[in-house]
UniProtKB/Swiss-Prot annotation:
It comes from Actinobacillus pleuropneumoniae serotype 5b (strain L20). The lineage of its organism: Bacteria, Pseudomonadati, Pseudomonadota, Gammaproteobacteria, Pasteurellales. This is Triosephosphate isomerase. Its main location: cytoplasm. The gene is tpiA. Homodimer. GO terms for molecular function: triose-phosphate isomerase activity.
Length: 256
């Protein structure tokens, strides 16, 4: 089946009120004619109100967020709930990013609980998976990815991936300027889809698998020619409207 590509910008810990308004204005101008690719941005949660207001009146760019907690309300200082994100119109929610796994010690079981919370709230989980450089060099890429996916399947069943997104991010390629070759990335994406297909071909056929390892305006087009790369989770290049637009349009063209 034809999967509609998704390109999502992860702003990480960047921006301000003014930056949010300015970047979204640039994105709206650059992406006004895009029809064949879904687009989302995940600003810092502090700026969701500015982003929601700036995105009003258009339907090309959806709003997302970079994290969520498993609790809906209560005495959980500093946390953000699914209901709060929905209140701002956020749809695509990143979980399991390597920076959360590394700096905040989030484990597969906890991330699976976040996945469940998002599904229960009717939001779209963007589950990040991927291996470190050491794991890559030790030939453990597939085992690591399978383990991270299986945490969700074991808790919720393979059907949980209906309408969900997986972002394969080789950790050694994030923010380093290194990137897997298109063939390397495709091989892992094909493995991920095959791993899910072993439980359900129908679920595997529809799940969006993004690539998230230093995607930029120079390497995007070649990555998107690969059959199992359904878009990108973009970091640094998402902070510049022209560069992000090139990536979106490359996905739209490749998957037309």
């Amino acid at each position: 089946m034809a999967r509609r590509p998704l390109v999502m910008g992860n702003w990480k810990l960047n921006g301000s009120k003014a930056f949010t308004k300015e970047l979204i204005a640039g994105l709206k101008a650059e992406l006004a004619d895009v029809k064949g690719c879904d687009v989302a941005i995940a600003p810092p949660v502090m700026y969701l109100a500015e982003a929601e207001a700036a995105l009003a009146g258009q339907s090309v760019i959806a709003l997302g967020a970079q994290n969520v907690d498993v609790n809906v309300q209560g005495a959980f200082t500093g946390d953000i709930s699914t209901e709060m994100l929905k209140d701002f119109g956020a749809k695509y929610i990143i979980i399991g990013h390597s920076e959360r796994r590394t700096y905040h010690k989030e484990c597969d079981t906890f991330i699976a609980k976040k996945f469940a919370a998002l599904k229960a709230a009717g939001l779209v989980p963007v589950l990040c998976i991927g291996e470190t450089e050491a794991e890559n060099e030790a030939g453990q890429t597939e085992a690591v990815c399978a383990k991270q996916i299986d945490a969700v399947i074991d808790a919720l069943g393979v059907e949980a991936f209906n309408g969900a997104v997986i972002a394969y991010e080789p950790i050694w390629a994030i923010g380093t300027g290194k990137s897997a070759t298109p063939a390397q990335a495709q091989a892992v994406h094909a493995f991920i889809r095959g791993h899910i297909a072993a439980k359900s071909q129908a679920v595997a056929d529809q799940v969006i698998i993004q690539y998230g390892g230093s995607v930029n305006d120079a390497n995007a087009a070649e990555l998107f020619t690969q059959p199992d790369i359904d878009g990108a989770l973009v970091g640094g290049a998402s902070l510049k409207a022209p560069a992000f637009a090139v990536i979106v349009k490359a996905a739209e063209k490749a998957k037309a």
